[in-house]
């Protein structure tokens, strides 16, 4: 079942895949990494002017990585606001997704956190570097295949 945004994108020949609706009835779409930046600009012009959140997750050990964007269309006098969830999947061997920092500035720290925890490179992001872990940290802590380094635990000292 397609939602109104999916139908609107299809009429304009914009390639995407409808993933249905979540438990709150919010439409979820899958966009290919190579199409994401242009579709993001179109969505912004269409009225999705607020990026509520961006996150990323590891789909499965050895599998794909996903970057998830929750967008809201806020218009004066329109209640409730329209929402959409966009998922962009990428291969873990070379995880690259175009940054949408220049479309929604609020994604700055969120894309940096996704880079820091999962190693997804957001192309054209102006300050893509670690934000939570030290620069010297090796690996991507939230990947399912991540092997945690052995640390000396305080409780072992007693």
UniProtKB/Swiss-Prot annotation:
GO terms for molecular function: NADH dehydrogenase (ubiquinone) activity; quinone binding. Keywords: Chloroplast, Membrane, NAD, NADP, Plastid, Plastoquinone, Quinone, Thylakoid, Translocase, Transport. Gene3D superfamilies: NADH:ubiquinone oxidoreductase, 30kDa subunit. One of its GO terms (cellular component) is chloroplast thylakoid membrane. The keyword Thylakoid applies. It is an enzyme of class 7 (translocase). Its EC number is 7.1.1.-. The keyword Ion transport does not apply. It catalyses: a plastoquinone + NADH + (n+1) H(+)(in) = a plastoquinol + NAD(+) + n H(+)(out); a plastoquinone + NADPH + (n+1) H(+)(in) = a plastoquinol + NADP(+) + n H(+)(out). It is found in: Plastid, Chloroplast thylakoid membrane. InterPro entries: NADH_DH_suC, NADH_quin_OxRdtase_su_C/D-like, NADH_UbQ_OxRdtase_30kDa_su, NADH_UbQ_OxRdtase_CS. It is a peripheral membrane protein. Its main location: plastid. One of its GO terms (biological process) is photosynthesis, light reaction. NCBIfam families: PRK12494.1 (NF009141). NDH shuttles electrons from NAD(P)H:plastoquinone, via FMN and iron-sulfur (Fe-S) centers, to quinones in the photosynthetic chain and possibly in a chloroplast respiratory chain. The immediate electron acceptor for the enzyme in this species is believed to be plastoquinone. Couples the redox reaction to proton translocation, and thus conserves the redox energy in a proton gradient. NDH is composed of at least 16 different subunits, 5 of which are encoded in the nucleus. Belongs to the complex I 30 kDa subunit family. This is NAD(P)H-quinone oxidoreductase subunit J, chloroplastic. It comes from Capsella bursa-pastoris. The lineage of its organism: Eukaryota, Viridiplantae, Streptophyta, Embryophyta, Tracheophyta.
